[in-house]
Design a protein with these regions (language model features):
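Helix-coil boundary and N-terminal low-complexity module in membrane systems
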Residues: 3-121, 130-223
Length: 223
């Protein structure tokens, strides 16, 4: 008889051939669990960045590379990126806060006619959303800080704009879905992050240097 053992790493099966149905169900269960973890750890709001970095790291390492354990990977990465993510949170909060300060009074004017200033602010918001859509996955993989992180983000946007746009659209779709149905928090964070990883990992591998980064992990280079 086939014995099944469930763990956060996945279903361990005594048979040599893994059942693809169980594998799929296990990954779906892990995505739901990660979505719940992300939601709980994001409740203080200021921890959203650290939670997102931890979510991305865990999705790639545990779900896609089948290494490490889910809880250990998530909370280790949450701690590792906590302070840096706070600084990033403040930058984006100030940026979008300033845009909102000038945009909200223009909403009534926009309803009665075209307001070039309002649409200019919307354009600036879209520009800000591009780096926001992948900055937390980036800090989960690379050790750039300050100006080096800004240069890296701009380089990726310049060379892989279509990928970044895809990530931004995924993020926007996920936010809209959660706003329309809060119960979607049970799966949206994990699913959006998983799909984003399919777009971002080929890009990140191009800039992962095993010979120059002492913190390089070998699974970074796996397909």
């Amino acid at each position: 008889a086939m014995a099944l053992v469930f763990s956060v790493k996945g279903y361990a099966m005594n048979s040599e051939k893994k059942n693809p149905l169980f594998s799929l169900l296990n990954q779906l269960g892990q995505l739901i669990l990660l979505s719940i973890l992300w939601t709980i750890c994001s409740l203080p709001v200021i921890t959203i960045g650290a939670s997102t970095a931890a979510l991305y790291y865990t999705v790639v390492k545990v779900l896609r590379r089948h290494q490490d354990s889910l809880f250990a990977a998530f909370f280790r990465e949450f701690r590792n990126n906590f302070l840096q993510s706070l600084n990033i949170n403040m930058v984006f909060l100030c940026y979008f806060g300033i845009l909102a300060y000038f945009a909200i009074p223009r909403l009534s004017a926009t309803q009665s006619g075209a307001d070039i200033g309002f649409y200019a602010l919307v354009g600036l918001a879209i520009l800000g959303a591009l780096p926001l859509s992948f900055v937390y996955p980036a800090i989960s993989r690379f050790y750039h800080k300050g100006g080096a992180l800004v240069r890296f983000l701009m380089m990726v946007i310049g060379k892989h704009l279509h990928i970044v746009l895809g990530c931004a659209l995924l993020l926007a779709a996920g936010i809209l879905l959660v706003l329309s149905n809060p119960a979607a928090l049970l799966f949206v964070p994990g699913v959006v992050c998983y799909v984003q990883s399919l777009l971002l990992e080929p890009v990140f591998r191009k800039y992962s240097a095993a010979d120059s980064d002492p913190n390089y992990e070998m699974w970074y280079g796996e397909n």
